[in-house]
Amino acid sequence: MSEALASSSATLPPGQLRARPRSRPAVRPVQLGTRYLGLLSAWAVAIGLGFKSELFTPNQIWLATAGLSIFVTLGLVFLHARNRTPAWLSLDHYITPVLTIVAAATFSMQPALDYRVPALAVLIMGSFIFASSFVDLSRGMGRERPLHRFLRDATTFCVLLALFYIVLQSNDLPVVFKFSAIFVIALLSGYRSFRFATKREGVALLSAFLTAGTVTFGAFGMVTYLNQGSQYVAVILAFAWYAWQGLTVHALDDSLSRRIMFEYGLFAVICVYLIALALVTGRPIG
């Protein structure tokens, strides 16, 4: 009797299949994209527009700059962590936004400038924060495009040039601090570029260190022997940095070709021409 009940209970009616338990898909956090990045950049612009206010002293503006840098950095850390960007704790994701904020704040503290110049600097700051972080975000999602490398190089170069000009034209900074600042700016910007060419932190840091040392040595020579203004020297230093780091990036990436050597070598030739022109002229140009 029991065997009959067991066989009847185990037998299903014809046409009816035994239902399989469905496995629930793993819950994946919603990825954040350009809307979040645009909102973060807009908040940075809104806060940065207050840097030119006459109600703040320079020390208070520096404190506000540090606070804005921390705010933007934490926002980008949350963005990359939520999207599971590879190596989201690496400093190269946050170098350009922080340097851009410092450059915009320094322009805002210039007393002789009209309010439109600091406002334009803050707007450019917001666009650079968005562009540089968008490149990192797209690269982390596997959506890298050829234009992204141009955006990365353009934002890094422009911020580098602005900071070089600010440091060189500052009369309050001692000479030692000027060259130290140039070294740090070139080091961080170079590390940002070299991290795109290699995943090894040591190689990127060593390449950035050599690039920064070369640029700082060139700055010392030009400030000492060239009778030129800060704008002229800043342009030469930025071109020299761009040529050196460009050749090094492609050498690390194993993509160095004759065309690339010609393109970056052209910047080196321009630097040599500008230095020779200043030496021959012997007076400020422009």
PLM ranges: what are they?
Residues 1-142, 257-262, 269-286:
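N-terminal topogenic module of multi-pass integral membrane proteins
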Residues 31-38, 85-97, 137-160, 176-183, ...:
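Cytoplasm-facing juxtamembrane segments at the starts of transmembrane helices
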Residues 103-111, 160-172, 216-232, 271-286:
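Hydrophobic alpha-helical transmembrane segments in multi-pass integral membrane proteins
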Residues 74, 192, 243-247:
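Transmembrane alpha-helical segments that form the membrane-embedded catalytic/substrate-channel core
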Residues 98, 213-214, 233-248:
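Hydrophobic alpha-helical membrane segments
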Residues 226-228, 248-259:
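Membrane-helix boundary connector in multi-pass membrane proteins
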